[in-house]
């Protein structure tokens, strides 16, 4: 699913949202998540999963063109860990829909 497909789904699910408002909501959420991760914070969405950072230590690599050894510096990369409900749902074992899919749940 692409970002534009996510925006379209959000607009379909909530008819009171104009497509432009749904796009703004998705962009705002993604910006907030990006900002939090860039500051080293962890993001947890219960029932869905968590986003965090994994540290990749410095290492000696090899330039594929010249074969020369190069020092690759330490870096942090974003990482997603799915929650139990999402893992079970993807695996097909969960009998109940996620709370966000429950039309009777008016949060």
Curated annotation (Swiss-Prot):
Annotated Gene3D superfamilies: IHF-like DNA-binding proteins (4.10.520.10)
Domain of life: Bacteria
UniProt GO BP: DNA recombination; regulation of DNA-templated transcription; regulation of translation
GO molecular function, one term: structural constituent of chromatin
SMART domains for this protein: BHL (SM00411)
Keywords: DNA recombination, DNA-binding, Transcription, Transcription regulation, Translation regulation
SUPFAM superfamilies associated with the record: IHF-like DNA-binding proteins
InterPro entries for the chain: Hist_DNA-bd, IHF-like_DNA-bd_dom_sf, IHF_beta
A GO term from the CC aspect: chromosome
Pfam family of the protein (one): Bac_DNA_binding
Ranges of biased composition (kind: Basic and acidic residues): 82-101
Disulfide cysteine pairs (residue numbers): none
Disordered: annotated segments: 56-107
Assembly behavior: Heterodimer of an alpha and a beta chain.
Described function: This protein is one of the two subunits of integration host factor, a specific DNA-binding protein that functions in genetic recombination as well as in transcriptional and translational control.
Family that this chain belongs to: Belongs to the bacterial histone-like protein family.
Name under which the protein is recorded: Integration host factor subunit beta
